[in-house]
């Protein structure tokens, strides 16, 4: 591809992911709290539910959610935010998760250990006769099972509490497809949509998040053979490079190539299930 081709695709992706050319943290906070409050009221439902991992994304989305329900209550609408801790046994960075909960200040906190359910599913797969190709493949699949068990737990609570599940997907993760389909990618509302990773950090900082939360190294921490593996190691590019792409800045050819490969390869994650009316794509 030529430089002009790269730039053309970059502009199209930025528009598709709704990344604004300019950023004002305080304005984004106000806009996103308004969005959350208005949406919940419009549904007639009463509760937001979100899993809090300890990272900046869930911390930021959680604080926005809490502020939105407080606004609704001040206006006479009975609303509540439930933060869920969803460890897989003992979480490696539990201290960070507790710090995040203190920042979010949710109305209610529920803790559900997903390890028994995730391990039981893996055992059932093995007992069925299914054979994994390598221990690494088994570990990867097991990691995605954990992510999906977490979403099952959140939807169970939301279903019982007239609730809506919040997702933490933002433009950088959406661009790279770095989420589990029907796991952490399964949600009803995405208050961080359109933000690059550095802009999520900017919102978190403006909300009063301490630097240990704001600058925590992003990790899905789903694989037991590679605990706390940074997202950037999986990408092969840094978040700064991803964010530069999203914010319309020039990046090296290798960054264009890597970003576009991830974006094209994860297109199915950003779409509803295909039907015969969708394929072949126009």
Curated annotation (Swiss-Prot):
Gene3D superfamilies: HUPs (3.40.50.620). Pathway: Cofactor biosynthesis; NAD(+) biosynthesis; NAD(+) from deamido-NAD(+) (ammonia route): step 1/1. It catalyses: deamido-NAD(+) + NH4(+) + ATP = AMP + diphosphate + NAD(+) + H(+). Pfam families: NAD_synthase. Keywords: ATP-binding, Ligase, Magnesium, Metal-binding, NAD, Nucleotide-binding. InterPro entries: NAD/GMP_synthase, NAD_synthase, NH(3)-dep_NAD(+)_synth, Rossmann-like_a/b/a_fold. ATP binds at residues 51-58, 168, 197, 219. Its EC number is 6.3.1.5. GO terms for biological process: NAD biosynthetic process. CDD domains: NAD_synthase (cd00553). Mg(2+) binds at residues 57, 173. Catalyzes the ATP-dependent amidation of deamido-NAD to form NAD. Uses ammonia as a nitrogen source. This is NH(3)-dependent NAD(+) synthetase.
